[in-house]
C-alpha cells in the first residue's frame, strides 16, 4: 500500500483526529467526509475499532502499511517493556519524526520532505532516509546551506514547546533525543493495545 499524499483534512475528519496537530481540520466540520452531521454512522465492530486505531497511528506518522507492519514486528522483538509502547517509541525515533519534534518542521509530512531533500544531518553526516532510527545522544542538525530556508526558520519561530525527551539549540539549529520517551509523553489519543490486538488476529 502506498503512502497517502492527499489532503490531510479528509483523513483527519474520517478518523476524528487532527493529523497536523493543530486541530484546524476538525474546527469547522468535526465529522467524516460525506456525513452531514454527527451520529450518522453506526457503531463500529471490534475489528473496525482496532482497524481504525491502527489507521489513526499510521496516518499520524505518515507510513505505508508495509513500513508500519515491519516496525510493529521489530517492536515485538524487544524483550523489555510492552509491545505497543515499544512500537510507539520506535515511531518516535524515526528521523522525520525527530525533525518534527525538534520544531524544524510544522508537520511530519514537511519534516519527511526536509529529510528526503537532504537538508538534515545526523552527527554531522547527511541522512536522507526518513525511517533512519535516531539513537539517544545523536545530534540531528540542519545542513549549513539549508539554515536560512523559510520553511525551517518559520517552523522554529512558531514552536510553543518541545517534548521533555529532546533538547534543542536554536542558534545552531540542532538537537538530540536525550532519553527514550515515557508512554504518558506520547500520543494520548491512541490506544496502542487495540493495534496489538489487530495484528495478533492476522
UniProtKB/Swiss-Prot annotation:
An annotated Gene Ontology molecular function: rRNA binding
PANTHER family: 30S 40S RIBOSOMAL PROTEIN, SMALL RIBOSOMAL SUBUNIT PROTEIN US4M
Ranges for region Disordered: 22-48
Protein name per UniProt: Small ribosomal subunit protein uS4
Keywords: Ribonucleoprotein, Ribosomal protein, RNA-binding, rRNA-binding
GO cellular component labels: small ribosomal subunit
Family matches, as PROSITE patterns: RIBOSOMAL_S4 (PS00632), S4 (PS50889)
Statement: the UniProt record of this protein carries the keyword Phosphoprotein: no
Annotated organism of origin: Lactiplantibacillus plantarum (strain ATCC BAA-793 / NCIMB 8826 / WCFS1) (Lactobacillus plantarum)
Lineage top rank: taxon: Bacteria
Protein family according to the UniProt entry: Belongs to the universal ribosomal protein uS4 family.
InterPro entries, A to Z: Ribosomal_uS4 (IPR022801), Ribosomal_uS4_bac-type (IPR005709), Ribosomal_uS4_CS (IPR018079), Ribosomal_uS4_N (IPR001912), S4_RNA-bd (IPR002942), S4_RNA-bd_sf (IPR036986)
Complex formation: Part of the 30S ribosomal subunit. Contacts protein S5. The interaction surface between S4 and S5 is involved in control of translational fidelity.
Job description of the protein: One of the primary rRNA binding proteins, it binds directly to 16S rRNA where it nucleates assembly of the body of the 30S subunit. With S5 and S12 plays an important role in translational accuracy.
Gene Ontology BP terms: ribosomal small subunit biogenesis; translation
Domain S4 RNA-binding as annotated: residue spans: 93-154
Amino acid at each position: 500500500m502506498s503512502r497517502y499524499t492527499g489532503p490531510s483534512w479528509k483523513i483527519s475528519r474520517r478518523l476524528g483526529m487532527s493529523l497536523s496537530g493543530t486541530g484546524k481540520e476538525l474546527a469547522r466540520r468535526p465529522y467524516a467526509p460525506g456525513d452531514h452531521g454527527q451520529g450518522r454512522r453506526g457503531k463500529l465492530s471490534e475489528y473496525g475499532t482496532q482497524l481504525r486505531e491502527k489507521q489513526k497511528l499510521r496516518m499520524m506518522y505518515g507510513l505505508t502499511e508495509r513500513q508500519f507492519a515491519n516496525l510493529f514486528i521489530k517492536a515485538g522483538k524487544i524483550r523489555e517493556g510492552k509491545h505497543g509502547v515499544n512500537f510507539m517509541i520506535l515511531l518516535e525515533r524515526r528521523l522525520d519524526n525527530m525533525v518534527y519534534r525538534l520544531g524544524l518542521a510544522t508537520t511530519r509530512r514537511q519534516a519527511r520532505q526536509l529529510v528526503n531533500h537532504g537538508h538534515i544531518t545526523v552527527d554531522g553526516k547527511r541522512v536522507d532516509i526518513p525511517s533512519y532510527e535516531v539513537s539517544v545522544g545523536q545530534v540531528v542538525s540542519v545542513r549549513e546551506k539549508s539554515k536560512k530556508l523559510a520553511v525551517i526558520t518559520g517552523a522554529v519561530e512558531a514552536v510553543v514547546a518541545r517534548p521533555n525527551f529532546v533538547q534543542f539549540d536554536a542558534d545552531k539549529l540542532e538537537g538530540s533525543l536525550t532519553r527514550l520517551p515515557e508512554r504518558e509523553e506520547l500520543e494520548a489519543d491512541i490506544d496502542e493495545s487495540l493495534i496489538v490486538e489487530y495484528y495478533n488476529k492476522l
